[in-house]
């Protein structure tokens, strides 16, 4: 059997493949980790970018950044991006792309979102809101983003979008509740190629986003920052 629904099929010779943990240690069949490949058709590195090459290609092995596992039947399953993993305080890992795509896909009030958890007490979300749609919704209630009452209404609306996936919500059970965001930050600008927060394929560059908003991420793990009506959220909706 060369293929099975949901898999990428079997390895094509002479390509070599292994699954590794965050320390580069090879994992046994069935365990999920980073997909690492080697072979004559695998790229040798990045053009005129030795730093990225050193991070990605080691001893001829290409660390793809993809998350997956090999089944006992020798079938490869790709499950997301390895470097985007949420990591809970007890070390459990989860790929956030499905949640992020669902939030953006079902909500007209969320343009972009990135989830974050790096061995932290809870998961947080960085949200780029769709201010135009929020303003249209608010207009029916004679509210605007020009005053605090209106901004609090918009923040509450964003919270309701996140809560649709929690217990009692429209999409309850779609994702494990422990990985859903407990709080969120409203960002002042979108992720773009110009600010290098998305790449040419329109994928988020998580490292850049985390670096740019490191202070804000830390703030969300404080008692003040965990409150959705914190001053930073109110200011970023102006």
Put a short name on every predicted segment.
Residues 112-114, 121, 165-238:
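Conserved C-terminal "lid"/linker of ANL adenylate-forming enzymes
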Residues 1-6, 21-22, 49-52, 131:
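Active-site loops of AMP-binding adenylate-forming
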Residues 2, 6-11, 26, 57-59:
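Short Gly/Pro-enriched turn/cap motifs at secondary-structure boundaries
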Residues 18-19, 69, 197:
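Hydrophobic beta-strand positions
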Residues 25-30, 34-88, 229-236:
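Conserved ATP-binding/catalytic segment of the ANL
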């Amino acid at each position: 059997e060369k293929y099975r629904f949901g898999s990428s099929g079997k390895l094509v010779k002479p390509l070599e493949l292994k699954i590794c943990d965050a320390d580069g240690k090879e994992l046994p069949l069935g365990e999920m980790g980073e997909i690492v490949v080697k072979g004559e058709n695998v790229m040798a590195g990045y053009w005129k970018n030795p730093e990225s090459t050193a991070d990605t290609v080691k001893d001829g092995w290409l660390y793809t950044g993809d998350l997956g596992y090999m089944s006992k039947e020798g079938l490869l399953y790709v499950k997301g991006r390895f470097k985007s993993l949420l990591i809970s305080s007890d070390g459990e890992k989860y790929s956030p792309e499905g949640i992020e795509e669902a939030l953006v896909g079902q909500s007209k009030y969320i343009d972009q979102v990135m989830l974050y958890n790096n061995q932290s007490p809870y998961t947080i979300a960085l949200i780029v809101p769709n201010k135009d749609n929020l303003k249209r919704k608010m207009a029916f209630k004679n509210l605007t983003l020009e005053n605090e009452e209106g901004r609090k209404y918009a923040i509450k609306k964003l919270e309701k979008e996140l809560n649709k996936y929690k217990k009692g919500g429209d999409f309850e059970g779609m994702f494990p509740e422990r990985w859903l965001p407990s709080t969120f930050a409203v960002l002042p600008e979108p992720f773009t190629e110009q600010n290098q927060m998305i790449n040419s394929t329109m994928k988020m560059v998580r490292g850049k986003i985390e670096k740019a908003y490191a202070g804000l991420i830390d703030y969300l793990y404080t008692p003040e920052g965990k409150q959705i009506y914190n001053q930073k959220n109110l200011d970023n909706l102006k």
